[in-house]
Amino acid sequence: MNLKQILKGFFVTLGILFLLAAIIVSGYVLYRSYIKRQQIPKEVILTEQEKTQIAYEENLSLSLKNRDSYDFVVVINPAHGGLDAGKESTYGKEKDIVLSVCKQVVAANTDSKVGIFLTRDDDVAMDDEMRLAFLEQIQPDLFIDVHLNKADTANSVGTTVYYSTAYYNRKLSNVELADIMERSVVSAIEGFACGIFEVEREEMQIIKELSIPAVSIACGDLSNDKEGQLLATLPYQKNVAKGILNGIMKAKDSLEK
């Protein structure tokens, strides 16, 4: 075998080795890429019910952790949530506006002895069974249910408060609490009082189940253009919240006499 044949065989062998090396390297790169893809967590798609349950448990856990730090405890329920938008208009959805108002009540509270907890602090749908379970765990002194109205006529405007006679506290009846809350909110927003009424609306039935002072307040009407525009603004929501907080403090004073 001459030198030329030897060199030819050498380069052929070398070429084969390079080809095998390239195949091995490419295979390794593809394998590592596959492993990395497998390690990337896949997006978990939760149902509305699962989202609600998770949010409820987190909120309850945090609330229970802080509950014993306060001498007087209030639970506020921002009505509706999640797929249940409540009343709707061009100015917004009831679920969003009342949640914002309720958060402003918590933010405005400066009394370190008063704890204010929300049944929901996010856009999740809760049923009355969950709300009652939350109340059973927290054991508040006062309950405020916050809604909006939407009448069939655009002339409807103002604040309405609903109460139940199923429970009576000699220091503060639900009728008296309803009157306090309406006066406080109307004063804070310089608005209109539509009166206090015994509860009939289905979405407010929770207040009939409680053995503490409790009312449902509809703090405005989305069917009215002027009031609807105001309810959609943060400054006005803060004024509504101020009125609710003032009412809470007056109710506290009555209960502690």
Which role fits each region the language model picked out?
Residues 174-199:
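Active-site-adjacent substrate-binding region
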Residues 84-92, 151-180:
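A short, glycine/acidic-enriched catalytic loop
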Residues 73-77, 115-119, 142-146, 160-163, ...:
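Structural recognition of the beta-strand scaffold that forms the well-ordered cores
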Residues 1-20:
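N-terminal Sec-pathway targeting helices
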Residues 47-134, 138, 157:
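Active-site histidine-acidic residue metal-binding/catalytic motifs
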Residues 25-41:
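Hydrophobic single-pass membrane-insertion segments
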Residues 81-83, 121-126, 148-153, 167-169, ...:
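Solvent-exposed loop/turn segments at secondary-structure junctions
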Residues 145, 149-152, 195-257:
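Active-site-adjacent mobile loop/cap segments within catalytic or ligand-binding domains
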